[in-house]
Amino acid sequence: MATAPAEAHLVEPIDALDPSFPPRFADGSIHPLMTRLRAEAPVHYCRDSKYGPFWSITTHKDITEIEALPLIYSSEASRGGVSIVEPPADRQGQAMEMFIAMDPPRHADKRRVVALAFTPSEIARLGENIRVRTAARLDSLPRDEVFDWVKLVSTDLTTDMLAILFDFPWDERHKLPVWSDAITSINLIDNNPQERLNMMFEMAARFYQLWQERSNAEPTPDLLSMMIHSSALGQMDQIEFIGNMALLIVGGNDTTRNSMSGFIDAINRWPDQWEKIIANPEIIPNAASETIRWVSPVSHMRRTATQDVEFRGHQFREGDKVVMWYISGNRDERIFEDGARFIADRENARRHLSFGYGVHRCVGARLAELQIQVLISEMAARNMKVELAGDVIRDPHPFVGIIKSVPVKITRG
């Protein structure tokens, strides 16, 4: 298993590189490693890693091609699911079923129900609520003193939105990010799996209680009730229900939260881009897409080959893990010129892969985009200047691009 220092990508033979080595995702060295792989070995085989052997797919074109063939490259939980990191499991250690970890045709029926909560009309209905809450949050922040943007802005805004989506008890909403962090925590997976399981069981018990309550009540427009009263999802067993709730909590929490946090990092690295946004508010929707591209809140998605297949001259065997590195495809020089830079008005920012591609494209993409757009818009309307007051701390996580802390000070607006 690789234990090389973070700068090893500069000297190691290409065959010895392990793109999943967790510290790279905390110190940023994952980006030059991926640049090297795109140039020298865009389809790369890692024989020895913490997560076993796997293939890496690193270019935008190759990722979309793999994504477009879901019956050859499977997402099924029974085959390993969508990540090389340990997935959520039940008490027997079996991976929890969730619709993201299903293949067609089963996947489409399950996804269709959840998608009802994210139609354009539903997003429009939520829009004013998002704007009011975002404005209030920004106006409540301390001025000229250091605070953690992740804690006071990113986490609070995404937690409130999740609670509204689920109609989760408002006075308990603080539990949602705690459960999300437990599901994804590399530290708990590696060092305290029982604590992780305990927290997941707590989540399961609370959502099962809500499931029982709403099963016996009239349907309401929240996502939880929609799932329970739908023909496609209403007959699912308890484990699948909890698996889907885990998916929606992590998806709704981590993608948006980490993009909101990463935006502050980006505009401090390139302050001219923030001034460009303030001067040209019409580019804000594009700037939100560029944020999602540059941050890459989901670093990879994993598939499993269902048959022997040749790809770009390489032979994949049935059962091989195939890892699509979104964090690499989002900076592919063939698609995104100067892709390591945040460029607020980048013309093709929406071609990012952070929401996936094909049948598994993120069902909540519109809502995530809206939340980020509103945050940028409300900051720009206040001519707000948010300056870093310390290092941005990232988690050593090869699946979710978790930003743990962004110490800042508001010096204007």
Regions found by a protein language model. Give the residues of each.
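Cytochrome P450
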Residues: 1-413
